């Protein structure tokens, strides 16, 4: 897997990879990450992939991160509570 672009963003670390005839967009926020795969034949090139990172898309991504964080925190609390019962 090869890094082809690191996209500057004030909140997220956004990296675009090229691998196996696909572009992979990896968006990281703290300890969570989301990945999106796009077949390289479905886009004209890297500029088109980067253009997909609209404000609307990134707001949706942020909302998903919030939900992921809640889910993970709940799972952690549940596990900790179960350990204390033993």
Language model features: what each stretch is:
Residues 48-86:
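Acidic, low-complexity intrinsically disordered segments
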Residues 2-39:
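N-terminal acidic leader/helix
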Residues 4-7, 43, 49, 66:
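Extended aliphatic helical segments
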Residues 32-54:
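A hydrophobic, small-residue-rich beta->alpha segment in the mid-to-C-terminal subdomain
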